[in-house]
């Protein structure tokens, strides 16, 4: 595999300063013509860099298509906490390093293109915090692959020209209980994450519940 593989370039680009995520579902009365026209309009209004597009399993099925490995989320049977499913038929990741207001208007324009067949069910505003830390202050994305390894990790290959270069996305909204987290002492906070906040070093004897051991894919 070479680095010339086709990918939506925003997938491998650095995390932008500002972002907006839109989840959309099919309208119950949307017919095939409306869906087709909406998707054609979407393709003409997105570039894969400033706007990244994902298709949900239900939409792919509605289009009488098949993507091996694509499926809707279902909570693990052994889950000990509530893990609700929030499926979407379309997922849009709008990216900008300049103006969050421009993202608002771009999102409105895309929603208007899609309105005959899709409705926005969730919209999330995002930003890059302190050059790549999550809101608890720990570095985010430490183990993300880079260079050719990133391409090899992100891109589908050997599935034919229609699928090669595509990617899978698993979207997980998290709520930070910051007041509760801040109430712990520094050592406890580091053990919860599995890394030391001051130097980002992984803790060898971190407990099995540590974040670093549960979020690797």
Language-model region placement:
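Long, histidine/aromatic-enriched segments associated with O2/redox biology
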Residues: 1-217
